Structure formats: structure tokens, C-alpha cells
Amino acid sequence: HRQIAGWGWYSGRTEAELSTIHKFSIGAAPRATGYLGSGIVKGRVLNQFAMDDHQGFLRVATTTSRAPSPDAHSTISVFEDKGGRLEVVGQIDQIAKTEDIRSVRFDGARGYIVTFKKTDPLFVFDLADPRAPRTMGELKIPGFSTYMHMMDPTHLLTIGYDAADQGSFAYFTGVLLQIFDVTNPSDPRLVHKEVIGTRGSSSEALTNHLAFNYFAPKNLLALPMTVCEGGNGASGQYGTQMTFSGLMVYDATVASGFALRGKVAHPNSATSGDAQNTFGYYDMGCSNWWTNATSEVKRSIIMDDYVFSVSETRIKVNHLNALSTDVKELSLTQ
């Protein structure tokens, strides 16, 4: 029931855009898994974080059309199962006209959406009454988040891209880490930010939340990262030099923000001899589009006083107090 002709938008495009949602019961007992019902929602769903079941109600965030279409907007719809029919019982429509959703997070009675065209509006929604959801607050800042993580009930920890405003649009630039205070949902505030590299810098965590490793017991944030420098990201030019490929580990707290603890180098597999060149940079171009961001390191695990970083070719073990020194390395190609 979903009608989408292509990725882009052009003037005069009028196709309807709908998504069908199917509900199933899942269980281990015989015949415990089965079809329960369906419903239709306007627009398209970004990813799994755009759907959430809470106290018997399904909340869904969608975008209709695509930026910069004047018809582009987003919607939060709340569904209730009524005898096999998923019916909309509450809705907030026409959110952020001309923009599209870049990240979503539902947390109990609240919802958070980041949209983007040239700035990053963070919207906070009150979903306590499923039949009367409402917008509580909004914050507009440069850039956008592609993943939002609940640091605690009143703070969001996010990763995304910084952006340089060009008037009618914006260039995405370096990788952006942010902490938002949403204690007062009517007045969300950016309390800390960290920009890594310039345009062309990338992380697997930008497009895959499994690469985003926030370890709350130690207030540590471990992120796969490709760092590019040089060039002029504000004018759309990609970085001219890759200065780091590997895992970056930050101390991340609400009180103090981000402090780089250290780095675990994983030189890119395309590098000659798997080492840095004579200028101290990694031999690989700096170019990526935000929707297919990736990095050499794919995952990390923090265990006791050690961090394990995993790429497609190796696993490294490093002590959290001496990240630049490898304790052990295991090749996955031999």
C-alpha cells in the first residue's frame, strides 16, 4: 500500500505516500505466533526507532514527501487495536514543514524527533494521553542527529553531523556529538557538543546504532571513527587528509560533557602496508554521504578495564587507561 516513485523530489510530484502496518503476536508455544491486524499511516517510517508500543498503544513517526518539497512534513500517529483494525486515535501532524525526519526516540510518555533541511530542530512531544498527544518544546541548532540515546530520563546523548548554513540549504560537515537537557520539555537545551573532523569524517555509529557504545557504569562513549581534516567543509569541500581510522573513546557526562580519553588505531585496510604514510596520514580518500556512513571499526565492547574493538580484519584489546598501546591483536584474515 506504499507508493513511492523514487528517492528525490521534484516540482509537480503528487503521488500519495502511505505505509501499511501489520501487527502479530509472537510466542514460543504452539500456534502462539499469528496475525492480529493492520492499519494504514501516511508517509514512511525511517527505522525501528520510529515505532514504539507503550501501554497498548502503538506510536509511529513518519515523514510525507521529501525535503525540500513544500509538501514535506512529519507526523506522529497513535494507534489502538480495535478488533483487528489498527485505528489512529491521536495524531500530531504537519511537524517541521519542508523538512524530513533524521532520528526518532520514544521514551515512555515522551517522544523526540530531529528533522533537517538546514538546521536541526529537536522536538519534544508529550504522549501521556494517547488520544491527545501534543508538542511540548523545540530547539533549533545547526546540524542534525542520526541517532538519539537516552543517557538518563532527562538527557539525550546523540551522534550526527554538524552543518554549515548556505542560506536555502546546508552542507553537512564534521561528526557531531551532543548532550541535550530535556528536564523541562517545554525548553530543551543543548548543554554540550563536540565536533570531530570535517566533511568526509564518518562513523559506523551514524547509520548503525549497534556501533554506538555508551557504557553508563563508567560514563564512557566508544565510537568507531574515520577522521578527515583539511579542505573547506563549510563550502562543501571534503577533507583532503584522513588523519585517523579506528576507535575513539570519550568520557561523557552530563556535568562535564565530552573529554577524549584516547584512541585505538585501526589503519584502513586500503592503506599500503596497513600503516600510515610518510606524512602521518592514512592513505584513503575522505568522501562519504551521510546515509551510507561507515568506518573501519564496526563494533566495540567494554569489559572491566579493557575495550575490545572489532573491524572486518582484526580484533584489538586495549586498556582503558592506555588506549594507544595494544594489549593483544587477533587477525581475522589468517
Question: Whereabouts are the PLM-identified features?
Answer:
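Beta-sheet-rich non-transmembrane sensory/scaffold domains
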Residues: 1-334
